[in-house]
Amino acid sequence: SEYLVRNWLREVEEGSVAKPKKPQRAQAPWDGRPWAVNFGEGASRCWEDGRRWGFVSAGGGDWYVRTLKNLSPGDLVACVIPAVGYVAVGTVTRSVSRADVATVPTDEGEVPYLELDLEVDNPGQFLDDPDDRLAEHIVLVDWSEARPSGEAVWKKHMYANQNTVTKLRHADTLEALRHEFVWPE
């Protein structure tokens, strides 16, 4: 066997030292609260409805809906509209359910979600999907503070994630949200 090897060696130039790694964002230990919940607006949902009626929602694929199942009554959530900012903090009051079977408490009692006076034209998008992968799902939330999207809180380096529901433990974001919002007791 023959080996052909060639080394290119050069003198180390002054100042050509490897750059140090970028520091990681500070993370607080996660104690089960709060969760960050993305509220993506579109044809089947808008933040004004979620704010008015007390819910977060997702649909259009299993990837979007799956993490809603992490939320349970009593969980604290911070709601963020992607590319806009944080708009609400509240407590989950009812676990995830399909939009076509969900009911929402109103002054007149429990009303089916699809019968609410909603701003969107198609709140029941994909409800004909038999295996739930596309159907719109909602989780009810009692907002301790909920703002219009025009008053969202966003500062450089705040926590954002593409998943619908994630653990919120980014220390700087938690501090900013505790300063900006009224939190439930």
Regions found by a protein language model. Give the residues of each.
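Contiguous surface segments at macromolecular interaction interfaces
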Residues: 1-37, 41-42, 60-63, 101-185
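Short, basic/aromatic beta-hairpin or loop at an interaction surface
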Residues: 42-58
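Short, well-ordered loop/turn sites that connect or cap secondary structure elements
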Residues: 68-72
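Beta-strand cores of modular interaction/reader domains in eukaryotic scaffold and signaling proteins
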Residues: 78, 91, 140-142
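Short, charged beta-turn/beta-strand-edge "cap" motif at the junction between a beta-strand
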Residues: 80-86
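Short beta-strand-centered aromatic/proline hotspots
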Residues: 86-97
